[in-house]
């Protein structure tokens, strides 16, 4: 069975800059509303169907959570749905913030 891959926040940012990669944030709505990575799509149970309809299976998908734990399960789920290049962002949003990468705040 295919597996997701791990990627650090710098690698994730580089992939976003040089490809058609999509960044999805699976944190709770309140956390996402307060602050999230620039260009992040809030992936929830309610938005998963529209996301899967809008994204090509060949597009790289980066999955972000709080610390890089929950994103692994979500990344594997996306692999199981047929997405070919899925990455779990190690360290999650916390690492993204620590690395001072682009963030949108409410």
Swiss-Prot record:
Broad EC category: transferase
Pfam family, one: Rhodanese
Single biological process term from Gene Ontology: glycerol metabolic process
Annotated localization: Cytoplasm
HAMAP family: Thiosulf_sulfurtr
Domain Rhodanese stretches: 17-105
Catalytic residues identified in the record: 65
The keyword rRNA-binding belongs to this UniProt entry's keyword annotation: no
Organism: Vibrio campbellii (strain ATCC BAA-1116)
Function comment: Transferase that catalyzes the transfer of sulfur from thiosulfate to thiophilic acceptors such as cyanide or dithiols. May function in a CysM-independent thiosulfate assimilation pathway by catalyzing the conversion of thiosulfate to sulfite, which can then be used for L-cysteine biosynthesis.
Annotated EC: 2.8.1.1
Gene Ontology MF, one: thiosulfate-cyanide sulfurtransferase activity
UniProt entry tagged with the keyword Transferase: yes
UniProt name for this protein: Thiosulfate sulfurtransferase GlpE
Superkingdom: Bacteria
Keyword annotations from UniProtKB, A to Z: Cytoplasm, Transferase
